[in-house]
Amino acid sequence: MGKQATPRALPENEAKAVARMLRVSPQKLNLVAQMIRGKKVDTALAELQFSRKRISTEVKKCLESAIANAENNHDLDVDDLVVSQAFVGKALVLKRFHARARGRGARILKPFSNLTIVVREVRQAEAA
């Protein structure tokens, strides 16, 4: 009588992870997401490890989660994984008040972002 299971949205050779409500603007997060797009996961992890961007640690956690999902939930080979998609979405924006001179006030916007990373298993024969 319950709901039927929805069909899998991703192909069988893909897995994904989503990080929501990251406290960074989408533009800044997209700089880091753009850096790992299309690369092998070990190369992407190394680049995130030595990146000087503050948000790169959160992106690294999300990528590690996608790798773990691929290995544990979908039985994919970790050595053949490639970051097929890494895209950023806008979440909410907190609006704060900053008191200024002469009784005025200024608005401070604190944006949040969502990050989705999709990894795909690419066999060596397909890559060559």
Swiss-Prot record:
It holds the Pfam family Ribosomal_L22. GO terms for molecular function: rRNA binding; structural constituent of ribosome. Gene3D superfamilies: Ribosomal protein L22/L17. Keywords: Ribonucleoprotein, Ribosomal protein, RNA-binding, rRNA-binding. One of its GO terms (biological process) is translation. GO terms for cellular component: cytosolic large ribosomal subunit. PANTHER family: CHLOROPLAST 50S RIBOSOMAL PROTEIN L22-RELATED, LARGE RIBOSOMAL SUBUNIT PROTEIN UL22M. Belongs to the universal ribosomal protein uL22 family. Part of the 50S ribosomal subunit. This protein binds specifically to 23S rRNA; its binding is stimulated by other ribosomal proteins, e.g. L4, L17, and L20. It is important during the early stages of 50S assembly. It makes multiple contacts with different domains of the 23S rRNA in the assembled 50S subunit and ribosome. HAMAP family: Ribosomal_uL22_B. NCBIfam families: rplV_bact. This is Large ribosomal subunit protein uL22. It comes from Methylobacterium radiotolerans (strain ATCC 27329 / DSM 1819 / JCM 2831 / NBRC 15690 / NCIMB 10815 / 0-1).
